Amino acid sequence: MAVNRKPRAGRSARPKANPVRGEATLTLAGVEYVLRPTSEAAFAIEEELGGSMLLLVQRAGSVALSYRELGTIAGAFIRAGAAPDDKLTANINDDALADLIYAEGQVKVLGILSAVMANVVNGGYTPQGEPRAVAETP
């Protein structure tokens, strides 16, 4: 039976993923995390893993990413999606995420992360992850 837990006093509820912003939800160990595709997250992933986001998307499509790489990717997108007052999520550990991904299942998690990475390389969002305005045609 599912328990409906309310946030403790002084803590806000976790934000929900907004697909209009290209966000997705990743559930690890029963906790839902918002994955938000921002330029800051993309730059952190590229710097940490030493490759372009496009190359990482290609590797994801070939199921060629390690657990640690998946933890790094998930961590950057989770930190980008953290609520401003959620210091615990904002400081989430990539190695701990890799362990949780191992427990959850690499293929399941890879599908979700691949969708968010595809949103990064396909564009249509501001660096902060908001949808870009569409110009009206005359």
Question: What residues fall within each predicted segment?
Answer:
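Short capping micro-motif at the N-terminus of alpha-helices
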Residues: 35-37
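Short, hydrophobic/amphipathic alpha-helical patches that form generic packing surfaces
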Residues: 69-80, 115-118
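Charged interaction scaffolds used for protein-protein
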Residues: 1-32, 51-65, 84-138
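Amphipathic alpha-helical interface surfaces
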Residues: 41, 66-74, 109
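Short, surface-exposed, low-complexity cationic segments
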Residues: 39-57
